[in-house]
């Protein structure tokens, strides 16, 4: 599927705090811990626990969330299909949408029981 400017803007204006519990509920149902969830978010965004909780309390949008993030340099290694969108085919002009889908992919992998070493991608040496 193709990302549109309207879709990108809709996601950009969503409140992270309203989506966070949906992510967590999914992971909890699959027996994952909040620590694992936050480890994945920290790897991807650079947000420690305090910063993450402040962003949730401040009800920031996904736009602000990703503007403040320091996306991991290996994030480009997150590939695959999420909600019908192939991450690596999302155009550069929709980077925010791509980052949202990358984070969802990490959460999907965690929910499916993938090992943390595989989720937190490392360059092969």
PLM regions: where:
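A charge-rich, low-complexity, intrinsically flexible signal that marks solvent-exposed coils, linkers
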Residues: 1-125
């Amino acid at each position: 599927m193709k990302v549109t400017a309207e879709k990108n803007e809709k996601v950009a204006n969503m409140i992270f705090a309203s989506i966070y519990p949906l992510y967590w509920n999914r992971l909890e149902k699959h027996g994952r811990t909040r620590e694992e969830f936050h480890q994945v978010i920290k790897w991807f965004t650079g947000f420690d626990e305090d910063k993450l909780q402040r962003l949730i309390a401040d009800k920031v949008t996904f736009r602000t969330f990703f503007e403040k993030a320091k996306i991991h340099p290996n994030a480009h290694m997150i590939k695959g299909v999420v909600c019908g969108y192939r991450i690596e085919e999302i155009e550069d002009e929709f980077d925010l949408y791509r980052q949202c889908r990358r984070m969802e992919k990490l959460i999907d992998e965690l929910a499916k029981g993938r090992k943390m070493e595989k989720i937190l991608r490392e360059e092969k040496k």
